[in-house]
Amino acid sequence: MQNISSDTIQKHPPLSLPFYYGWLVVSLCFLTTLTSAGVRSSPQVLILPLQDEFGWSRALIASAISMNLLLFGVAGPISGYLIDRFGPRKVMMGSLLLLICGVSGTIAMTQFWQFFLVWGIIVGLGAGGVGSVLTATVGNRWFVARRGLALGILGSASSTGQLIFLPFFMAMIAYSGWRIGSMTLIVVALILLPLIFLFMRDDPADIGLEPYGADQTGAGGSAGAASLRG
């Protein structure tokens, strides 16, 4: 009897919302991908400050950025495997933890190999964990109707993250220095972690729901008439 009671409790959404729970899942995934893209692109803004403080050449710094981009791409298949095995929620949290560790290491670094490790490798892998594979998985698991809208929102997260974070990071560096600017990136990621832990779910069935529009026949024809309310 106790097992039945526990299962029943787990089938309820953690929040009572006036709209379909999948839109909250999309929002969390969007914010995570946006933050990841912003952090991943931030080293471009660090080139001049690092040159001035450590005397590293532009080519040397660019080599770490290139490694970051390489691992971001290589991490895609790894991310897909981990999502299949552990679910989007754990992969999102693990990726954010890697980003937090990488940016935190930046604040204490004194040598180039440390910069290469934290930004080139750790941040590159962390950002790759929440790329297009994650957004496609979330969109397809949670939506039948409005799937195109959900995927479109998630697909815009990467470019939006760069659009928001780069000017913000540049302003923080100009007013407070690059270390304080890096700390703001950590704060943003730390805010997201408990939200994902509490409210992110891997699949609609985990909270007793079906994918949005799954109960409609001819979901493709009726998707345009479906509202945001589930």
What spans do the regions from the language model cover?
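Helix-loop-helix hairpin linking two adjacent transmembrane segments in secondary transporters
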Residues: 154-207
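Helix-breaking motifs and short loop linkers at transmembrane-helix boundaries and internal kinks
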Residues: 55, 87, 108-113, 143-144
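Extracytoplasmic
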Residues: 21-61, 75-79, 166
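Cytosolic juxtamembrane N-terminal segment immediately preceding the first transmembrane helix
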Residues: 2-32, 37, 227-228
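Central cavity-lining transmembrane alpha-helices of secondary-active solute carriers
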Residues: 66-81
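C-terminal ends and interior cores of transmembrane alpha-helices
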Residues: 97-111
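Cytoplasmic helix-loop-helix junction between adjacent transmembrane helices
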Residues: 119-156
